[in-house]
Amino acid sequence: MAAARKDAGVLALFDVDGTLTAPRKEVTPEMLEFMKRLRENVTVGVVGGSDLVKISEQLGKSVITDYDYVFSENGLVAHKDGKLIGTQSLKTYLGDDQLKEFINFTLHYIADLDIPIKRGTFIEFRSGMINVSPIGRNCSQEERDDFEKYDKVHNVRPKMVSVLREKFAHLNLTFSIGGQISFDVFPQGWDKTYCLRYLEEFKEIHFFGDKTYKGGNDHEIFESDRTVGHTVTSPNDTVQQCKSIFLSE
């Protein structure tokens, strides 16, 4: 019965961190079960800033078949029905010389940054973006939580973004603060709206995300004319909103 009611023209599209899972945590069995139920009614997709490996760590190894669409790196790597349907490369787009200039400057900036602790993996190069973390991505969860609180008071990431934006204005880059400890850097237009080019068949796209404010990594897709945007505060809130929108009968 449920499958027959499915509205193929409607897509529910979800951010990962803070929307389907707690930040950098694994999805709960309850959320997986709810998503399965939701898929009986509407088409379901996820779009995350992280690469597919990290999204799989959070949503499970079968993620590309658990959802109709999986967009990693904001959709620069796109899967539909478990199959790869598109990729885009930052290296090809910017070239090695400009990449090296950006990475060198960023590492020098972090080296001179006075913050309580630093760990490792300050820059992570992905196929479609660069992720920059002033504290370093391999800090512990406790250190992540502490840095997030420190950053809210001292604006470490916003200040760093401001410097980089001015220094590299000629590259037309977007800087998007997301998660607890880092920010993403990518060419303008390579934000989460990038995935919408694969979704033209849908008459209604509902997007759910927690960082929908200006500067947050859900902002552009939340504001897009192509989507109906919903701001969520937690995975539980996501479930409640979806129930009232899609499963209210």
Curated annotation (Swiss-Prot):
Cofactor dependence is on: Mg(2+)
The family annotation for this protein states: Belongs to the eukaryotic PMM family.
List the EC numbers from the record: 5.4.2.8
Q: Which InterPro entries does the entry link to?
A: HAD-like_sf, HAD-SF_hydro_IIB, HAD_sf, PMM, PMM_cap
Share what the entry says about its subunit structure, partners included. Homodimer.
List the expressing tissues. Expressed in roots, leaves, flag leaves and immature spikes.
The answer to keyword Cytoplasm applying to this record is yes
Q: What protein does this entry describe?
A: Phosphomannomutase
The kind of enzyme this is, by top-level EC class, is isomerase
* Primary gene name: PMM
Question: What keywords are assigned to this protein?
Answer: Cytoplasm, Isomerase, Magnesium, Metal-binding
Q: What is the originating organism of this protein?
A: Triticum aestivum
Where along the chain is Mg(2+) 2 bound? Answer: F222, T227
